[in-house]
Amino acid sequence: MPSFGENPEETIIREIEKFVSEHPGNRKPEPDGIPYYDTPLVGFADANDNLFSEFKDIIGDFHLTPVEVLAQSFPEHTASWDGSSVISWIIPVSQSVRESNRKETRCSSKLWADAKIHGEELNIQLQEHLASFISEQGFLAIPPILSPFFEVLQLDKVGSSSNWSERHVAYAAGLGTFGLSGGLITTQGIAMRCASVVTSLKLNPTQRSYSDFREDCLFYNSDTCGRCMERCPSGAISQEGHNKDLCMVHCAQVMQECDYNAGVPSV
C-alpha cells in the first residue's frame, strides 16, 4: 500500500488533523488569534455498508450510495468497488466561539459568523486536499458534494434535501446520532462542520457505538431536555422535529439584518 503503510487510517487522521490545525483560516486574525475549530473527529465506513442502501428508504431514492458516487465519478473503472471506503470527519466549533454565541437570541455572534464563513472555506479545501492526497498514492477519491452530480432538491414533505447528506454519512461512520433539531450529536457536541470523501482505498470501518439513530438525544431517550426548541428564535424546532422552511426564512432575514461579512478577510 503506497506510503500509507500498515495503518492507513492513522495516516488519514493525521493528515486531516494537520490540515485543520495549520490552515490560516482556522484562527481569528491577530491580536486575538482565537481558533475557530478544534481537533477533528474522523470515522470510516465500508462503502458497501447496507446502511447506505437503507438511506434511500429513509431520505429518498435520490440519495446516492458511496458505490454510486464512485461509479458516476469514475466510469472508466470497470472492476468491483468491493473494499472501497468512506472517510467522514467532524470539525468541532471551539469553546471560545460557542461561548460568544450563547448570549445571542436572534442573530449569531460576529465570532460565530466569522467561524462559519472560514469554516466552510476550510472544509471545502480540506475535501479537495484529502482527495488529492489519496489520489497521489494511486487510489481513486472524490468528495461527493464537490462533484458535478451533487444537487439539492426541494421536496414537498421535508423541504430542502440533498442527494448526499454529510450528517447521515457521519452517522454511518460512527461519529454521532441525531437530535430533535436534526443536527448530529457528536462526542464534542452538536456545533460543528462535517464533510466526507469516498475512495477506492480500503480502510477499516469505525465501529458504531450506538444502536439507535436518536440514541444520544435526551428528548427522545428520556423525554427530557428540549432546549433546542426553547433556543430556536424562529420556532422551527418542535416536538415534530425541524421545519426547514421556517429555518431558512429566518436565516434569510437575519442575513439582511446583520452585516456578517464586515471585516472578514478572505482566506
Residue spans of the language-model regions?
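Non-catalytic, usually N-terminal nucleic-acid engagement modules in DNA/RNA processing proteins
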Residues: 1-116
